[in-house]
Regions:
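Short, small-residue-biased leader/transition segments that mark boundaries at the very start
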Residues: 2-7
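Active-site beta->alpha loop and helix N-cap motifs at the rims of alpha/beta catalytic domains
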Residues: 8-11, 25-125, 143-150
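Short, glycine/charged-enriched secondary-structure capping and boundary segments
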Residues: 18-21, 51-53, 104-106, 154-156, ...
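Short secondary-structure boundary/capping segments
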Residues: 27-28, 131, 190
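Glycine-rich phosphate/ribose-binding loops and adjacent secondary-structure elements
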Residues: 113, 122, 126, 138-218
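Flexible, glycine/charged-enriched surface loops at secondary-structure junctions
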Residues: 125-133
Length: 218
C-alpha cells in the first residue's frame, strides 16, 4: 500500500494536485498498481500551530514552503484527494493536542463530525462527475477525542452511523503513554463497525502494531 499526504508530502503545494490529475492520478504518477491511501492533510495543518486559524468552514494557514496563505476545509481536502485519485481518502479532521482540556476536546470532536458529513457529501458529488479519475474512491472517517473515553466512544458511535467505507482511530501516539493508548483503543474499537476496516493512524512500532492487530485494527 502507498501513503500520500495532501499537505505534508506537498502534493497540493508541490507539484500540485492538478498536475497529478493531468498525469492520470497518483497510480500513474508513481507507477504503482497497488492501493494508495491519502491523508487529508489535517494533521499536518494542525501541526502548524502558530501559522493557522481554525474556523467552522475550515482552516486558514500559511505555507511552510513560501509563506502564502492557504485555506483548506472538508470540501477542498476531498477535491484535492479526488484529483490525486487515491484508493482511500481520509476525512478532514482536527487532531487536537492529547493534553487539550475536555471542553475544548468535546467542541473539536463535534466540529470534526460536522466536517465528516461535509466530506461525505462532497465525495459523493465528486465521484459522480464524468471527469473523475477514480469514481470508486473510498472515504474513511476518523475517530478523535484524545484520552477521554466517553468522548471517544460517543464519537465512534456517531461516525459509525454514517456507513462509511472504513474508519480510523486518530489522535494517538502524540504524547500519551502506551498504556493510555491501549486503554483508549480497547474502549473505542467495540463501537466501530466490525465489518469495515479500521486503521490506526500514526502508530508504527512493532509492539504497537501487534497490540493493534490483537484489537482487530489494521
Amino acid at each position: 500500500r502507498g501513503l500520500g499526504d495532501v499537505y505534508k508530502r506537498q502534493l497540493h503545494v508541490r507539484p500540485g494536485d492538478e498536475v497529478v490529475k493531468k498525469m492520470g492520478g497518483l497510480h500513474k504518477f508513481m507507477v504503482w498498481d497497488k492501493p494508495i491511501l491519502t491523508d487529508s492533510g489535517g494533521f499536518q495543518v494542525f501541526s502548524l500551530a502558530g501559522l493557522r486559524k481554525i474556523k467552522e468552514e475550515g482552516v486558514y494557514f500559511h505555507s511552510h514552503v513560501d509563506g502564502r496563505k492557504i485555506f483548506m476545509g472538508p470540501e477542498q481536502s476531498m477535491q484535492i484527494q479526488s484529483n490525486l485519485a487515491s484508493t482511500i481518502a481520509m476525512a478532514f479532521d482536527e487532531c487536537p493536542s492529547s493534553v487539550a482540556d475536555k471542553k475544548y476536546m468535546a467542541n473539536s470532536v463535534a466540529r470534526t463530525t460536522r466536517w465528516l458529513k461535509r466530506c461525505k457529501d462532497e465525495m459523493a458529488r465528486l465521484n459522480s462527475l464524468p471527469d473523475t479519475i477514480n469514481p470508486h474512491q473510498m472515504l474513511f472517517g476518523i475517530n478523535q477525542g484524545g484520552i477521554y473515553e466517553d468522548i471517544r466512544i460517543a464519537h465512534a458511535q456517531q461516525i459509525a452511523e454514517l456507513n462509511l467505507d472504513g474508519y480510523a482511530v486518530g489522535g494517538l501516539a502524540v504524547g500519551e503513554s502506551h498504556e493510555e493508548m491501549y486503554r483508549i483503543l480497547d474502549a473505542v474499537v467495540p463501537h466501530l463497525p466490525e465489518n469495515k476496516p479500521t486503521y490506526l493512524m500514526g502508530v508504527g512500532t512493532p509492539a504497537n502494531i501487534l497490540e493493534a492487530v490483537d484489537l482487530s485494527l489494521i
